[in-house]
Amino acid sequence: MTVHEFGKDNKNVVVLIHPALVMWDYFEYVIPLLQEKYRVIVPALPGYDEDKPGDFTSVEEIAAELARWLAAHGIKEIGGIYGCSMGGAIVTRFLADQRIRVRAAVIDGGITPYQLPWIATRCIAVRDFLMIYMGKLGGIKLLEKAFATDDYSEEDLQYVAKVLCFVSAKTVWRTFESCNNYKMPMDFQSGCKTIEYWYAQAEKKARKLDIAYIRNHFPQAVFKAFENVGHGGLAALKPELLVAELERVMGGKEER
């Protein structure tokens, strides 16, 4: 897994983990706002790295690989970690593993494991796979039907179409299968005392089960809804707000 670093001379470490169907440059507007003050670490997740062909592995493996990379580079503590959607799933598992000390974490619309019968989870994975893979085959017109148009502009969908041109069918399948069904350690207690779960107000109903899961497994978590933004929209549409809120969380300040 390739890891991109910015602001290497800074001591306070911030890790950013991107969602599915995008590349690490999802944070292109966020990185410049952080790199003057923080050592910013952005992994290019397997299967979504245009410069390093391969397949997505799993939420568990990526969380473990990230922890190994950080330890190998002498990083025992990070000031903040942010993950969106699929990236939020990886943050959730990373926090549960407790291999690296985390002072503050933000799970933005993060996906939590389904608490459903096995056959139901397979049916959901097949549905999601077909929706996205048909978009890969059919291009932007089918993607427009697959995604809510109020959340994604045509430019956004063109970017997704570009990513889908190089990702494999195995990556698409593993993404949904793993994000929906990744395993968590038994009876874990995260040592991270400052955790926030963010979501768009418009997706509150869709995130209901994820919110309940986080509340149950991370009782210290605080929940924050954002108006006038869709799922995963902060990094691209409101990077200044994302950075301001992330710094608030890292500073231990209460929700505004």
Regions found by a protein language model. Give the residues of each.
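Conserved HGGG/HGGXW glycine-rich cap/lid loop of the alpha/beta-hydrolase fold
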Residues: 4-52
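Active-site loop/oxyanion-hole signature of alpha/beta-hydrolase fold enzymes
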Residues: 41-82
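Gly/Ala-rich beta-loop-alpha elbow adjacent to hydrolase catalytic centers
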Residues: 83-91
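Flexible "cap/lid" loop of the alpha/beta hydrolase fold
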Residues: 96-97, 102-132
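Short beta-strand/loop motif that positions the catalytic acidic residue
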Residues: 191, 197-199
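Conserved alpha/beta-hydrolase "acid-adjacent" motif
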Residues: 204-210
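Catalytic histidine-centered segment of alpha/beta-hydrolase-like enzymes
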Residues: 226-240
